[in-house]
């Protein structure tokens, strides 16, 4: 489609001389993602909260 403005080449894929919208990739977590830091933070804060509530 010609909208009268210059196409942004980051948003489109040129095919047959026309700018077609790119299909966005969904961010899927891979098995290499390191979540150890986030999990240990949750464990430390929950333990601290439990100690404060009990004493």
From Swiss-Prot:
Signal peptide: none annotated. One of its GO terms (cellular component) is side of membrane. Transmembrane segments: none annotated. Its main location: membrane. Residues 39-55 form a propeptide. It is found in: Cell membrane. Keywords: Cell membrane, Glycoprotein, GPI-anchor, Lipoprotein, Membrane, Trypanosomiasis. It comes from the Eukaryota. InterPro entries: VSG_C_dom_sf. Glycans are attached at residue 34. It is a lipid-anchor; GPI-anchor. A lipid is attached at residue 38 (GPI-anchor amidated asparagine). VSG forms a coat on the surface of the parasite. The trypanosome evades the immune response of the host by expressing a series of antigenically distinct VSGs from an estimated 1000 VSG genes. This is Variant surface glycoprotein ETAT 1.2. It comes from Trypanosoma brucei rhodesiense. The lineage of its organism: Eukaryota, Discoba, Euglenozoa, Kinetoplastea, Metakinetoplastina.
């Amino acid at each position: 489609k010609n909208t009268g403005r210059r196409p942004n080449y980051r948003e489109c894929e040129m095919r047959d001389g026309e700018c077609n919208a790119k299909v966005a990739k969904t961010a899927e977590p891979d098995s290499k993602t390191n979540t150890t830091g986030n999990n240990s933070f949750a464990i430390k804060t929950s333990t601290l909260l439990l100690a404060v509530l009990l004493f």
